[in-house]
């Protein structure tokens, strides 16, 4: 089983992770291609295409300009935000981290797909950003889908578990994916209606990755046995390809 999650805008490069050795990212040449485009933009252009403040545009202009000399950190330690905070990566053992290294991919606008211990540098590039007519979803789709197929070919349980947002999971081409895609949904029962509450769903995605790591889970079936921040599996609302977890 291979799990995908979205990268985060929030980064934490202040504290370094000392318990792991960094690995090399999967698509360095394609990352460099995007970097060349990003380095050609002025601060005003970055502010416009990324829809960010001039202050953030200045920070990212400086990052891209001197990218190779920026500090590196393992991806799973470098990202912050609701998903990553609930993985509780700082509490994972080396054995659990090594398990995630072969069972988790972090989807990124700049790096495409990252193994948890792949080295990354500080950056900002959301998957929905357009660079000189480059659609990042299209740019990455074939490469990432082919890579996932190759990885799952070596797995005993050949499932792709989708814990990424719509914007990021769209880099997987379902028509070219050779194996079963399983989507995860976290919903809340509010006055008899099932709704997805974005921030709570993000936290639950992180909690599920934590459970996968703690229990070395390699099958979607086993995920049904655990609660995730109050969300519990609902057989009534689920199918083989859509697993629904509900908080009452």
Curated annotation (Swiss-Prot):
Transmembrane segments: none annotated. GO terms for cellular component: cytosol. Signal peptide: none annotated. Pfam families: H2O2_YaaD. It comes from the Bacteria. Coiled coil: none annotated. GO terms for biological process: response to hydroperoxide. InterPro entries: YaaA. PANTHER family: PEROXIDE STRESS RESISTANCE PROTEIN YAAA (PTHR30283:SF4), PEROXIDE STRESS RESPONSE PROTEIN YAAA (PTHR30283). Belongs to the UPF0246 family. This is UPF0246 protein RF_0769.
């Amino acid at each position: 089983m291979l799990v995908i999650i979205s990268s985060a805008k929030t980064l934490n490069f202040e504290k370094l992770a000392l318990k792991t050795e960094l690995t090399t990212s999967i698509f360095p040449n394609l990352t460099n291609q995007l970097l060349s485009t990003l380095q050609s933009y002025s601060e005003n252009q970055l502010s416009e295409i990324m829809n960010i403040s001039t202050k953030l545009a200045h920070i990212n202009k400086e990052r891209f300009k001197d990218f190779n000399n920026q500090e590196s950190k393992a991806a799973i330690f470098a990202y912050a935000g609701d998903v990553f905070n609930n993985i509780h990566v700082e509490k994972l053992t080396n054995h659990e981290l090594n398990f995630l290294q072969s069972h988790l991919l972090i989807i990124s606008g700049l790096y495409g797909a990252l193994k948890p211990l792949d080295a990354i540098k500080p950056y900002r590039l959301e998957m929905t950003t357009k660079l000189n007519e480059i659609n990042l979803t299209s740019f990455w789709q074939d490469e990432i889908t082919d890579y996932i197929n190759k990885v799952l070919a070596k797995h005993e349980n050949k499932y792709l578990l989708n814990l990424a947002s719509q914007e990021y999971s769209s880099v997987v081409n379902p028509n070219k994916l050779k194996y079963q895609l399983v989507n995860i949904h976290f919903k809340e029962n509010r006055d008899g209606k099932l709704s997805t509450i974005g921030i709570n769903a993000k936290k639950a995605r992180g909690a599920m990755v934590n459970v996968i790591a703690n229990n070395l889970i390699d099958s979607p079936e086993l995920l049904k046995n655990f609660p995730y921040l109050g969300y519990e599996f609902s057989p009534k609302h689920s199918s083989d390809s859509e697993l629904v977890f509900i908080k009452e």
